[in-house]
Amino acid sequence: MCIRDRYILEALEAGKQVVTANKDLLAEHGEEVMGMADKMHADLQFEAAVAGAIPIIRPLKQSMAGNNITEIIGIVNGTTNYILTKMTESGMNYKDALAKATELGYAEADPTADVEGYDAGRKMAIMSSIAFNSRVTFNPVSYTHLTLPTKA
């Protein structure tokens, strides 16, 4: 765990409220971080780490708690969603769709985490941990990357 992540744990240990969008921390150390928040009765909010402006964490924790969720599927990365939409609706090729996403500011300067599936995999690990009430880390999450796909 890096120093930045330790600050979050220290804040929770001190009973402080924490708001984070750090999906790397939550995907790899979520059980420890959420456990510390529970132990110290500290409020840990991380809705921004998953699906941006789409509220999914609170519904998974509260509204869906009594349901039997069997799978979580979807396109949970905005850059990927944009690229796939351009490829399917406009017939744009992958390279041009990625360039346009970058030009519009949807893609990072280094879009590797987006197009290789790491970002989506981390988000799925976080959501799965909550939905299935079990520790799910990034490594076993099934995801498909976009690097050099053919035209849709």
List the model feature ranges, each with a label:
Residues 28, 51, 55, 67, ...:
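Conserved active-site and cofactor/substrate-binding residues in soluble primary-metabolism enzymes
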Residues 96-146:
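Substrate-binding/catalytic subdomain of NAD(P)-dependent oxidoreductase enzymes
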Residues 62-116:
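Conserved anion/nucleotide-ligand pocket segment
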Residues 1-5, 144-150:
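Conserved small/polar residues in nucleotide/adenosyl-binding loops
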Residues 4-20:
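Rossmann-fold NAD(P) dinucleotide-binding segment
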Residues 18, 41-51, 55-65, 69:
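Active-site-proximal cofactor/substrate-binding loop regions of enzyme domains
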Residues 23-44:
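Rossmann-fold NAD(P)-binding glycine/threonine-rich loop
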